[in-house]
Amino acid sequence: MDIKAKEKDYLTAYRSLNAEERLNLMINNYSTFPKIIRKMEVKTRYRIKSEKEYMRSHLRGELGVRVQSSKLSDPTFEEASTNIMLDKAMETGEAEGGLLNGIENAERYEADIRIISIMRMDYELLSEIVEDLDEDESCWMKDFLTKRKLLKEIASERGLSYETMKRRAYELRNDIREEII
């Protein structure tokens, strides 16, 4: 299943896929998958921070213009602690420490954080498996997965037939599938 970044929200798509489909999605988007993960992380961070700021403003009764009040607060500390909690949540996949307290649709954000963490772990495993192939196979497999070279070009460089290269790519893909699934 090949899903283009512009066509669908990857979080929703990834959440609904089984392990085989997730692997195919990662392989088909190997070169752009880290960027996709980062984009989903940035979007989720932005939404959570915006929602938290809206809730803070709403609780203070602000109408959009900040007015100095006598209440002691430390917005820099609040921002820093939110960033630290978001970093930890994105790394572990768990939103803890009251990160999502008072936010509407907190369960959706929690699910998004969990999926982003899973996406990152899945991709790291795939990358590690490709790296652990012998040096020559790892090199041409990365060229093929990142779409820098076609199998015909790789076969030609190695003095092999296209069919032989295609068969070897298929075997490696199956080996990768067995290790991941």
Which residue stretches match the model-derived regions?
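N-terminal interaction/assembly modules
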Residues: 1-126
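Coiled-coil-like amphipathic alpha-helices with heptad-repeat character
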Residues: 42, 153, 161-163
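Generic non-transmembrane alpha-helical segments
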Residues: 125-133, 175, 179
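Short amphipathic alpha helix immediately N-terminal
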Residues: 132-149
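Hydrophobic positions on the alpha-helical face of helix-turn-helix-like DNA-binding modules
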Residues: 140-141, 153-156, 165
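Charge-enriched, short contiguous segments at helix-coil
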Residues: 146-159
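DNA-recognition helix of helix-turn-helix
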Residues: 157-181
